A protein has these predicted regions:
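Conserved hydrophobic positions within beta-strands
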Residues: 40-42
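Short boundary/loop segments of OB/S1/cold-shock single-stranded nucleic-acid-binding domains
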Residues: 22-36
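Short aromatic-glycine-enriched beta-strand elements
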Residues: 48-59
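Short, structured beta-strand/loop micro-motifs enriched in basic residues and often containing a Trp
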Residues: 72-81
C-alpha cells in the first residue's frame, strides 16, 4: 500500500510540474487558421531562444505606417539551422512575414514564415 501511495505521489508531482510548460506552449491565444502576409521594413529583431521576435513597419495605401509585432516565433537556433542568415532580417531590411493574429491584439502575431526579397521562404510552422 505504501508503494502505491508513493508512486501516486511521484506521478502527481510530475504531472503538476509539466502543466505550466504545456500552458506556455499553447497557441490558443492565436488564430492559427489564419495566414496574414505583411511586407515591411524590419524595425527590431530579437534572435533568441525560446522564441524569436520581430517588428515590421508596413506602409499603408494612405501613406501611414503600421507597426506589426511578431511577438513569438520559432527558436532562433531553429531558424538558423533552416539556413536563414540573421543578416537577411537585420534592422532596415525589407522582408515579407506571414503570421497568425493574436485574438486579443490586432497588431500582434505569431510568426509562421519569413520570405526574403529573393523569394526564399523559411516556414516556422504550417
Amino acid at each position: 500500500m505504501k508503494t502505491k501511495t508513493l508512486w501516486q505521489t511521484i506521478v502527481g508531482a510530475l504531472v503538476a510540474v509539466a502543466l505550466p510548460a504545456g500552458a506556455h506552449h499553447s497557441f490558443a491565444i492565436y488564430d492559427m487558421s489564419q495566414n496574414i502576409e505583411f511586407e515591411g521594413v524590419v524595425e527590431t529583431v530579437k534572435m533568441r531562444n525560446p522564441h524569436m521576435a520581430l517588428t515590421l513597419v508596413e506602409s499603408q495605401a494612405d501613406g501611414s505606417k503600421r507597426t506589426i509585432n511578431f511577438v513569438e516565433g520559432a527558436p532562433a537556433n531553429m531558424i538558423v539551422r533552416m539556413g536563414l542568415n540573421p543578416a537577411d532580417i537585420a534592422v532596415g531590411k525589407t522582408i515579407k512575414a506571414i503570421g497568425a493574429p493574436r485574438r486579443d491584439d490586432p497588431n500582434a502575431f505569431f510568426l509562421k514564415a519569413i520570405i526574403l526579397p529573393d523569394g526564399k521562404r523559411y516556414s516556422v510552422i504550417n
